């Protein structure tokens, strides 16, 4: 195992609401870090600092997945991670079967944003990710 090897895949959004809000980099990611036994870790870069009161979540189909913001975790305030690691595989399964992922969060300024990501090609990209960083 390459000790520091980390593999990830990114998806850029296809729609953001509201449209007139200036934001930094916005993307959803799935990461593997084999040396730490981390697989399918879901995170999002939202492009703004989250509000400390924000309850960010992702929705795929009718299933919702709660995230913790970097503000809540004393980490980068513009990132969020899936709250319950036991839900990573369920989220991945839903992303394989779904058409889109919708992520919602609230900025430190109080703006609620809704970002939509296409899941077209997700299964193929995940297969490449698994090939690059197989489980140990």
Question: Model-predicted segments: where are they?
Answer:
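A generic "folded-domain core" signal
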Residues: 1-136
């Amino acid at each position: 195992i390459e000790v520091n090897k980390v593999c990830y895949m990114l998806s850029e959004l296809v729609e953001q609401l509201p449209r007139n809000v200036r934001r930094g980099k916005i993307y959803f990611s799935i990461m593997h870090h084999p040396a730490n036994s981390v697989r399918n870790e879901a995170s999002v870069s939202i492009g703004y600092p989250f509000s400390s009161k924000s309850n960010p979540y992702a929705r795929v189909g009718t299933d919702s997945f709660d995230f913790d913001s970097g503000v809540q975790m004393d980490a980068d305030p513009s990132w969020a991670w899936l709250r319950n690691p036991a839900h990573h595989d369920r989220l991945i399964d839903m992303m394989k079967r779904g058409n889109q992922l919708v992520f919602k969060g609230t900025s430190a300024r109080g703006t609620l944003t809704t970002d939509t990501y296409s899941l077209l090609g997700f299964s193929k990209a995940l297969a490449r990710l698994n090939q690059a960083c197989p489980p140990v």
